[in-house]
From Swiss-Prot:
CTP-dependent diacylglycerol kinase that catalyzes the phosphorylation of diacylglycerol (DAG) to phosphatidate (PA). Controls phosphatidate levels at the nuclear envelope. Counteracts the activity of PA phosphatase ned1. May be involved in vesicle trafficking between the endoplasmic reticulum and the Golgi apparatus. Involved in pre-tRNA splicing. It catalyses: a 1,2-diacyl-sn-glycerol + CTP = a 1,2-diacyl-sn-glycero-3-phosphate + CDP + H(+). It is found in: Endoplasmic reticulum membrane; Nucleus membrane. GO terms for cellular component: endoplasmic reticulum; endoplasmic reticulum membrane; nuclear membrane; perinuclear endoplasmic reticulum. It is a multi-pass membrane protein. It comes from Schizosaccharomyces pombe (strain 972 / ATCC 24843) (Fission yeast). It is an enzyme of class 2 (transferase). One of its GO terms (biological process) is phosphatidic acid biosynthetic process. Belongs to the DGK1 family. GO terms for molecular function: ATP-dependent diacylglycerol kinase activity; CTP-dependent diacylglycerol kinase activity; lipid kinase activity. The chain crosses the membrane at residues 20-37, 39-59, 89-109, 143-163, 180-200, 201-217. It comes from the Eukaryota. Residues 38, 110-142 are cytoplasmic. This is CTP-dependent diacylglycerol kinase 1.
Amino acid sequence: MSTKLTWSQWSKKHEIPRKALHTSIGFFALLLQGCGYHAAQIIPVIEIGFIPAFTGDVIRFNWPAFSRLYNRVIGPLMRESEKNAWNGVIFYMIGVWIVLKVFPEEIAVMSVLLLSWCDTTASTVGRKWGKYTPKIAKNKSLAGSLGAFVCGVFCCYVYWGLFRTGPDSLAAQSRIPFPWLCLINGFIGAFAEAMDVWGLDDNLVIPVVSACLLYLIM
């Protein structure tokens, strides 16, 4: 007889707080761009935020009492595997910093959307239906990749089909027809999410790989 989980237990099992934060970054990126903020204004904020995030991890690795407090407060926003490892938010910040610093702004924003939404979708779909489909990489299922693909198509439609629709947008200037661009974006999101680059954190790999591929095709 199965025991019914409490909301707290169910939320922890499915990483609801972490996924909610992860997903919200995509909406926040759209909000910032919609309000007229640009990479040059956002990069210093990321650099400032990186300092306490990195320092906090260094302290908790060397001070058990602080580590217990840190995990009690920040723990719900972390994977279980991060409790004794570097916090994923550090890699998130590095990945976003790189794409904002190196790539055109629209490509940077799209790569953040793919990180924020495709990664969460792949994780959610993979946990639910991954056991019914083949594994395509370590901890990656075909079901999760299909979820990431659909979400990548959705990201492209929302961003370049609804949000950035002017004649000066990269999508409008691209020689690739928009429906094909949506499909390609889906493949890029799925590929980047499933990719294992020297064991690096997905939060770093997904935006950088996505931005590189988008830059090449656009």
